[in-house]
Design a protein with these regions (language model features):
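A gly/ser-rich beta-alpha-beta helix-loop segment of oxidoreductase catalytic cores
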Residues: 43-66
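Internal helix-loop-helix
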Residues: 1-41, 82-88
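A generic structural signal for well-ordered coil/turn residues at beta-strand boundaries
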Residues: 18, 42, 56-60, 84-87, ...
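Alpha-helical interface subdomain recognition
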Residues: 1-3, 25-28, 37, 41, ...
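Short beta-strand-to-turn element immediately C-terminal to the catalytic PLP-Schiff-base lysine
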Residues: 23-26, 65, 91-94, 103-106, ...
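Active-site beta-strand/loop segments that form the cofactor-binding cradle
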Residues: 1-13, 47-51, 70, 76-78, ...
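A short core secondary-structure module
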Residues: 76-113
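Flexible, small-/acidic-enriched active-site or ligand-binding loops
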Residues: 61, 79-80, 106-140, 144-146
Length: 284
């Protein structure tokens, strides 16, 4: 939440989701090899979104072909955050008509296979990764493929970021409403500006309740209840964050449309979060 509130550009979320992928799907030998590296400071990321941007993680086009004791990869992944600096990534592929997760080291990926994407939020270092021609040892194939655990972990991190972002943008709005004067009155005294600010606060509290409920259920290993709460949090929070970002830009007037105003940064982050792992219509 604090990272979202301050619009922190960090590989933290991707690394945490990669940890969840290892914990839920890797063998004990793989865990003992990869998890200590993360503890020591290694950056990891996830490559689970196909080139068509599908929100269904089971719809996988990337393929793997076994050649001796190695696996040849084909296809591409998009929206891979921090791919250029991650020491390894967890990617989803289809192998013998089964969904598999594989570990790919950074030194196994050619530099020209990592392409920076132009996205609405440039604080997000998003890349497309071309898998064609990449070969990895079969020992880097995870024995399980718990996509549901990965999705829940990713949505929890994303919803926490949305919750923090709502706090940050609301503070930005309130500060400006209590600073800017028009016709010798603070603009925050006008009803047309006060009411949307209150609406944002109410949406924030509702979304945060869903988020904390989901986190509690995950901690208690109640995945079905956690999924319901997370979908409610994502649907409610993504819509609220986009609305709050838009109001922040509008309330700041012409200044809000410039790069010098932080309001546009919140709007960009809101639009990025809104379409990660499904928008509000998808989850409802």
């Amino acid at each position: 939440e604090s990272m979202g509130r301050n619009l922190m550009a960090s590989p933290y979320a991707g690394t945490i989701v990669a940890i969840e992928a290892l914990v839920s799907s890797a063998s004990e030998q793989q865990k003992s090899e990869w998890l200590p590296k993360i503890v020591e400071g290694a950056i990891a990321t996830m490559a689970i979104t196909e080139s068509d941007g599908s929100w269904d993680l089971s719809q996988i086009e990337a393929m793997g072909t076994v050649i001796g004791d190695r696996l040849s990869l084909h296809g591409s992944k998009c929206f891979v955050t921090d791919a250029d600096c991650a020491e390894f990534m967890v990617a989803s592929i289809r192998l013998d008509d089964e969904v598999k997760l594989v570990m790919i080291r950074r030194d196994e990926i050619p530099d020209n296979a990592i392409i920076r994407e132009i996205v609405i939020d440039q604080t997000r270092r998003s890349f497309q990764v071309q898998l064609d021609g990449i070969e990895i040892p079969l020992s880097q194939v995870l024995p399980k493929s718990d996509l549901k655990a990965i999705e829940l972990a990713a949505m929890l991190m994303l919803c926490a970021e949305i919750s923090g972002g709502l706090v940050g943008v609301l503070h930005s709005i309130v500060e400006y409403l209590n600073t800017r004067k028009a016709f010798d009155r603070y603009i925050g005294s006008y009803q047309s500006l006060k009411h949307p600010a209150v609406d944002i606060l109410l949406r924030l509290e509702a979304m945060r309740s869903h988020l904390y409920h989901a986190a509690t259920n995950l901690a208690n290993n109640d995945a079905p209840a956690a999924e319901i709460a997370l979908r409610m949090a994502k649907a409610h929070g993504a819509e609220a964050f986009a609305f709050a970002g838009d109001r922040a830009v509008q309330f700041h007037g012409g200044f809000g449309f410039t790069f010098e105003c932080d309001a546009q940064l919140y709007l960009r982050r809101a639009l990025w979060c809104q379409y990660q792992f499904g928008d509000e219509k998808y989850h409802r």
